[in-house]
C-alpha cells in the first residue's frame, strides 16, 4: 500500500537535494569530482559516443564536451553532456535518495493502493491526498527554457550525437516528449527517441501501445497534434518520464513528488502544451496523424540494432 510513510521516505528521511535544474546537478557533480570537461573539439558523429561508452563501462564520471563538432564541420554553440547517470551513486544523487528501493516501494503503492488499509485508517488516505495535491504542477508565465528563442529553428545546429556506426542518423536519446489527451486535456510525458531527419523534421519512435500514439488516434487524421520535446531539466523530471505510473497520476505530479517541490511549467510559444519551465531546450512542433517516415536503424540499450520501421514525423515550429 502507499502510505504517508512512503511519502516521507522520499520527502524527509533521505533527502539529499531538490534540484532546481540540470545546471545545479552538474555543478554538484563537478564539486564532487564526478564530472570532467573536454575543451577541444569532439565530433558528434561516433567520437563523442565512443568516449562516453568507455566511461560508462568503467564506471567513470559524467562528461561535458564544450566544443561538439556538427555534421557540417562547425562547432556547436551548445555543449553536450553525456553519462549523467552512469553509476548507481549518481543515479541516487539525481533522485535525491540514498536507496532507490524507497522510490520503487512508493511506485508500487501508487499502482496497487491498499484500499482496506486506508479504510481502517482514513486519516492516512487524507494525508496522502493532501500530499498529492501539493505536488500539482505550478503554472508560470515564462520559464528559463524560453530565455533564448531560435528565430529560424534548425535541429542541425544542436549537438545531437550519432552513437553507433549503423545508426540511421543522429538520435535524441534522452528526450522528454510531451503530448496531450485531446479529450481530457491531461498531459503525458514519455521518453521516445527522436531521429533528426533535417532542420525541421524529427522521427518520433512512439509505439502503438504508448500514450502519445493513443493521443494521435484521438486527434484524428484531419488535425495536427501538438508535440514538444524537452531536453535536460531537473533529473527527477527525466526519471518521471520513464516511470510506470497509474493513469490518475501525471508525470508532472510524480516529478514534483520526487524532487520534493512542485514542478514549474510554462506554456509553449507555438502550441498549447505546458512544459517544465526549467528544462534546457524545448523543441516545439506538431505531427500529422497518419504521416510516417522510415526511422532507424538504431543501436538500442539491449545490445542490438532496432531495424528500420515507419514512425510519425514531427514538424518543428520553435526551439
Question: What spans do the regions from the language model cover?
Answer:
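Extended, highly charged
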Residues: 7-313, 317-319
Amino acid at each position: 500500500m502507499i502510505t504517508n510513510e512512503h511519502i516521507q521516505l522520499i520527502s524527509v528521511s533521505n533527502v539529499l537535494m531538490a534540484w532546481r535544474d540540470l545546471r545545479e546537478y552538474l555543478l554538484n557533480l563537478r564539486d564532487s569530482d564526478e564530472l570532467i570537461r573536454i575543451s577541444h573539439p569532439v565530433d558528434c558523429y561516433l567520437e563523442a559516443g565512443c568516449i562516453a561508452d568507455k566511461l560508462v563501462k568503467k564506471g567513470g564520471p559524467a562528461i561535458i564536451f564544450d566544443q561538439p563538432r556538427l555534421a557540417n564541420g562547425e562547432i556547436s554553440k551548445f555543449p553536450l553532456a553525456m553519462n549523467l547517470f552512469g553509476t548507481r551513486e549518481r543515479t541516487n544523487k539525481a533522485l535525491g535518495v540514498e536507496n532507490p528501493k524507497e522510490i520503487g516501494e512508493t511506485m508500487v503503492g501508487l499502482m496497487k493502493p491498499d484500499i482496506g488499509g486506508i479504510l481502517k485508517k482514513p486519516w492516512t488516505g487524507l494525508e496522502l491526498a493532501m500530499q498529492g495535491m501539493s505536488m500539482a504542477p505550478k503554472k508560470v508565465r515564462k520559464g528559463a527554457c524560453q530565455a533564448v528563442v531560435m528565430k529560424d529553428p534548425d535541429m542541425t545546429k544542436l549537438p545531437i550525437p550519432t552513437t553507433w556506426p549503423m545508426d540511421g542518423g543522429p538520435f535524441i536519446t534522452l528526450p522528454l516528449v510531451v503530448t496531450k489527451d485531446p479529450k481530457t486535456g491531461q498531459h503525458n510525458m514519455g521518453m521516445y527517441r527522436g531521429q533528426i531527419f533535417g532542420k525541421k523534421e524529427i522521427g518520433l519512435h512512439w509505439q502503438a501501445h504508448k500514450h502519445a500514439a493513443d493521443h494521435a488516434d484521438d486527434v484524428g487524421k484531419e488535425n495536427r497534434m501538438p508535440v514538444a520535446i524537452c531536453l535536460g531539466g531537473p533529473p527527477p523530471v527525466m526519471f518521471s518520464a520513464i516511470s510506470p505510473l497509474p493513469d490518475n497520476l501525471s508525470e508532472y505530479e510524480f516529478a514534483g513528488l520526487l524532487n520534493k517541490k512542485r514542478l514549474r511549467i510554462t506554456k509553449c510559444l507555438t502550441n498549447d502544451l505546458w512544459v517544465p519551465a526549467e528544462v534546457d531546450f524545448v523543441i516545439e512542433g506538431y505531427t500529422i496523424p497518419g504521416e510516417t517516415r522510415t526511422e532507424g536503424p538504431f543501436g538500442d540499450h539491449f545490445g542490438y540494432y532496432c531495424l528500420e520501421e515507419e514512425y510519425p514525423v514531427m514538424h518543428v515550429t520553435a526551439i
